[in-house]
A protein has these predicted regions:
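N-terminal secretory signal peptides and thylakoid transit peptides that target proteins
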Residues: 1-13
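Beta-strand-dominated extracellular/periplasmic modules and repeats
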Residues: 19-169, 182, 186-193
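Short, exposed beta-strand-loop hairpins at the edges of beta-sheets
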Residues: 176-178
């Protein structure tokens, strides 16, 4: 219930804007996906960084919410490192099952960057034995704000901006709003099946 209070008004215009139920573009899940990660909402594990609260709504092509879908989220920490790959642990990784509204919420950190990519989040949704993967991106004006703050500012701005990233798609850009010391965002994932 608290999730709806936090995101209800923010997500409502987004849901209306996707009334056609056009499938969300699929993107490669990437080389750093791990299956053995904790089921949890808070992915931060005490790491420094700008908080990011994310609500995802998963639905089918007929705009019906998908309950019980496994949603995995993973991304780099503030220094651009993936857990389980560049550093030990499971920070910035986790999964949840969607509720009766097709929703999951995560509390994580704004990701850092690494040289070949613009900042992004990885998502993998599994339902009924079928898998969908995509990535979400961040507005560059928000990147400028975040990367001017510690611990990000030591590394400066990403070397690759959204337009230079070959996987970037404007329709996968997160809408973000300020929330306390961080941001909140919401996204509707319409699966192609």
């Amino acid at each position: 219930m608290q999730r709806r209070a936090v995101f209800g008004l923010f997500l409502l215009p987004l849901a209306r804007g996707q009334g056609t139920c056009t499938p969300t573009p699929a993107l490669a899940q990437g080389p750093y996906s791990l299956r053995d990660v904790p089921q949890r909402e808070d992915l931060r594990e005490g790491l420094p960084g700008v908080p990011l609260r994310l609500l995802l709504r998963v639905r089918d092509r007929a705009c019906r919410p998908l309950q019980g879908a496994r949603v995995d989220l993973w991304h780099t920490d503030a220094l651009g490192r993936y857990s389980g790959v560049h550093a030990p642990g499971t920070f910035c990784r986790g999964w949840q099952a969607t509720d009766e509204r097709g929703e999951v919420a995560f509390l994580t950190l704004f990701p850092g960057w690494y040289p070949s990519r613009t900042p992004h989040l990885h998502l993998r949704v599994e339902v009924g034995g079928r898998v969908f993967a995509t990535q979400l991106f961040f507005p560059e004006e928000v990147q400028r704000e975040v990367y001017a703050l510690p611990p990000y500012r030591e590394r400066g701005m990403p070397r690759v901006n959204n337009r230079q990233d070959g996987l970037f798609r404007a329709d996968l850009l997160l809408r973000l709003e300020r929330e306390g010391e961080g941001y909140r965002g919401a996204f509707v994932l319409t699966l192609p099946f």
